[in-house]
Swiss-Prot record:
Keywords: Cell inner membrane, Cell membrane, Membrane, Protein transport, Transmembrane, Transmembrane helix, Transport. The gene is exbB. It is a multi-pass membrane protein. This is Biopolymer transport protein ExbB. One of its GO terms (cellular component) is plasma membrane. The chain crosses the membrane at residues 13-33, 126-146, 168-188.
Length: 220
């Protein structure tokens, strides 16, 4: 099963399958590395934000301390406090009179959480698509390769096991390549999806804490 023979055969379809597999593998590993780095930094930053939020009784002081931290929880805390201040500054407006502070904060904090999580969704669709389609693309390459191998064998008239095993063995490499690309993509998708869920849980907990503290805030 020599890949060199596959490319030397000159079959454009089979060559295209292997080139596509190579590109999909490169995309997969680039996404895995970038997403893991981003997830690690987010968790590290979130841990620092949690410490500051616990150590400071004043929400204003806590938010000021976490302002320099690049983390989802920091962004959520800053935006939530800004929503509160905007509401207090415009209490005479029609919106403030029609919408209580409690409901206003719930709506705005939820919107903020959704925007923050969108930053961590990129690449997940690509990983899922690669994991789902790579085995079938590899299988297509195998079927195509076996079909042409049998045609060539029939035309040459050589029906020995050696004549059949070589070309068919080369075609089967496409299926192995599809699995080689798909398995890391599926494992990475599951791992990153779990990391994103943990991040969402952290945001939910922080949102609840911010909501309660802002409703009891006396000094904006």
């Amino acid at each position: 099963m020599n890949l060199k023979l596959v490319f030397e055969s000159g079959d454009p379809v089979l060559i295209g399958v292997f080139v596509l597999m190579l590109l999909m593998s490169i995309v997969t590993w680039c996404l895995v590395v970038l997403r893991c780095i981003k997830l690690y930094r987010a968790r590290k930053g979130n841990a620092a934000v949690k410490r500051h939020m616990r150590d400071n009784l004043s929400l204003n002081e806590a938010v000021e301390k976490v302002r320099a931290v690049d983390a989802p929880l920091s962004k959520l805390a800053q935006e939530a406090l800004q929503f509160y201040r905007n509401y207090r500054r415009n209490e005479a407006s029609e919106l403030a009179q029609a919408l209580p502070l409690n409901e206003y904060l719930v709506i705005q904090i939820r919107n903020s959480m959704a925007q923050i999580m969108r930053r961590f969704d990129y690449g997940m669709t690509a990983l899922a698509s690669i994991g789902a389609t790579a085995p079938f693309i590899g299988l297509f390459g195998t079927v195509w390769g076996i079909y042409h191998a049998l045609i060539n064998i029939g035309q040459s008239g050589q029906m020995s096991i050696a004549a059949v095993a070589g070309p068919i063995g080369e075609a089967l490499v496409a299926t192995a390549a599809g699995l080689f690309v798909a398995i890391p993509a599926v494992l990475a998708y599951n791992f990153l999806n779990r990391g994103t869920k943990i991040l969402t849980q952290d945001l939910d907990a922080m949102a609840h804490d911010l909501h309660v503290r802002l409703l009891n805030q006396k000094d904006s």
